[in-house]
């Protein structure tokens, strides 16, 4: 299943969804102001979903200033609160997946103990929950190893990984094919966009320096059941990327 991140206005998104038949990845509740007003904002957004004729939905959760592996108990509590609010919103809207960032920033956070603390957080967070797959996404993570450690330590079958190929290409020295090979058994969701490695531009596939001829067949072969979200804001980039995905059998 292909989804498109809600990075354009509703009118453009409605037309794009009609043209492609794709689902929507909601970013509305990645914003703390909306999480603080769920009772007010959820009904409004449900109406907007109907107006856009959204048929399938995933959700991107909050990430700014949050860190599930934080040593600071108050930061950890706020992270838990925001993730709980996003999970509740995902349930009410009928989203099947909730994408959450690791919060790890290379050369800011120490890698020692990070996997254990993150796994402890998600084991507690997911206790008693089912029906929504939580997908942990790489952003500034330098390589796949520690995220795989987290996946192996989290007990819930509703916990998986989200491979963002644009982030891996831009923010890691590990080649993309090594990310794909390592993540393959653990990935339920993929984010696609392109860049030239100098900045996380979220361009359409083919506009940056990702080797599509190598990466796309490898993704399709090694993660055949993973859903995919196009994370571009320019309508032209969205449609170009959609066509690339279809050309490679997604």
Language-model features: locations:
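N-terminal pre-domain/capping segments
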Residues: 1-85
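Hydrophobic faces of well-ordered beta-strands that scaffold small-molecule active sites
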Residues: 2-6, 22-26, 57-60, 98-100, ...
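Active-site beta-loop-alpha junctions enriched in small/polar residues
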Residues: 5-9, 27-31, 62-64, 103-105, ...
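Histidine-acidic metal/acid-base catalytic patches
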Residues: 10-20, 96, 144-159, 169-250
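Charged helix-capping and loop-helix junction motifs
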Residues: 38-44, 75-84, 112-120, 148, ...
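Alpha-helix-loop-beta-strand connector modules within alpha/beta enzyme cores
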Residues: 45-59, 118-131, 212-218
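Active-site acidic/histidine proton-transfer and metal-coordination neighborhood
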Residues: 68-160
């Amino acid at each position: 299943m292909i989804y498109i991140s809600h990075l354009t206005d509703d009118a453009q998104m409605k037309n794009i969804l009609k043209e492609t038949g794709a689902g929507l990845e909601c970013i509305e509740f990645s914003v703390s102001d909306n999480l603080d007003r769920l009772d007010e904002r959820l009904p409004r957004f449900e109406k907007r979903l109907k107006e856009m004729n959204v048929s399938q939905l995933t959700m991107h959760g909050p990430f700014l200033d949050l860190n599930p592996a934080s040593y600071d108990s108050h930061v950890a509590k706020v992270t838990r609160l925001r993730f709980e609010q996003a999970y509740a919103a995902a349930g009410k809207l009928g989203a099947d997946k909730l994408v959450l960032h690791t919060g790890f920033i290379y050369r800011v956070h120490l890698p020692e103990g990070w996997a254990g603390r993150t796994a402890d957080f998600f084991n507690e967070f997911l206790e008693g929950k089912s029906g929504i797959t939580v997908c942990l996404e790489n952003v500034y993570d330098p390589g796949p190893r520690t995220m795989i450690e987290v996946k192996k330590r989290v007990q819930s079958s509703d916990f998986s990984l989200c491979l963002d190929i644009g982030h891996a290409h831009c923010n890691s020295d590990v080649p993309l094919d090594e990310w794909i090979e390592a993540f393959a058994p653990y990935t339920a969701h993929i984010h696609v966009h392109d860049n030239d490695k100098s900045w996380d531009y979220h361009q359409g596939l083919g506009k940056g320096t990702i080797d599509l001829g190598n990466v796309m067949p490898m993704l399709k072969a090694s993660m055949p059941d993973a859903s995919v979200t196009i994370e571009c804001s320019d309508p032209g980039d969205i449609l170009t990327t959609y066509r690339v995905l279809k050309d490679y059998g997604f």
